[in-house]
């Protein structure tokens, strides 16, 4: 039936969101060049407008807009999609800083996975 098809589509979409998000997080934290570039953009965004734009595109408004578009397609509600994207991406953005200061990096990856599982489970319920 149609509800089952929609539920399966959402589950597939959630799995892809989780995979994509984890790959991006690992890219910006564990790959040496990307991690150093992220840290440089974080510092230089306040001195160089070009770096500020790159920072926004790669780490702030760019990922938020991408998630908003995904959630808009899934939810069919642009206003709800914006808030959902903020709720989803905000903690992930914070985890970049936590990761940088953590001795146990694997614990931060676990926090990322738990956040995504909890968030997407809550989203499926509502």
Predicted region positions:
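Helix-loop "lid/cap" segments that line or gate small-molecule binding pockets
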Residues: 7, 22-29, 38-46, 119-122
């Amino acid at each position: 039936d149609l509800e089952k098809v929609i539920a399966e589509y959402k589950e597939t979409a959630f799995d892809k969101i989780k995979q994509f998000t984890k790959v991006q997080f690992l890219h910006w934290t564990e790959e040496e060049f990307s991690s150093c570039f992220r840290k440089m953009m974080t510092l230089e965004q306040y001195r160089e407008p070009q770096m500020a734009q790159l920072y926004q595109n790669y780490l702030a408004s760019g990922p938020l807009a991408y998630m908003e578009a995904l959630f808009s397609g899934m939810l069919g509600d642009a206003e709800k999609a914006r808030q959902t994207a903020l709720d989803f991406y905000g903690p992930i953005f914070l985890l970049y800083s936590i990761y940088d200061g953590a001795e146990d990096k694997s614990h931060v990856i676990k926090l990322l996975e738990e956040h995504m599982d909890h968030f997407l489970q809550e989203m499926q319920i509502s």
